[in-house]
Amino acid sequence: MGGMMMGLEGKTGDALDLAFLDEMVIHHDGAVEMAQALLKGTKRPELIKLGNDIITAQTQEIQMMRNWRKAWFN
């Protein structure tokens, strides 16, 4: 967790908001990639559901954060 937080340390206001959005998009992209890899190999219904739920939710959140970034910082 410390590595993810380093990009936020010492920041406030717009700098914090921008760093948070950028880091969270990277974090969510990683989660989506992991879930996609899981779905290629697991046969467990619980993990299939979890993987699909992660892909759906975090893909939507990635788009939301990218839209906010564009609206607020471009």
Description of each model-found segment:
Residues 1-74:
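His/Met- and acidic-residue-enriched segments that coordinate or traffic transition-metal cofactors
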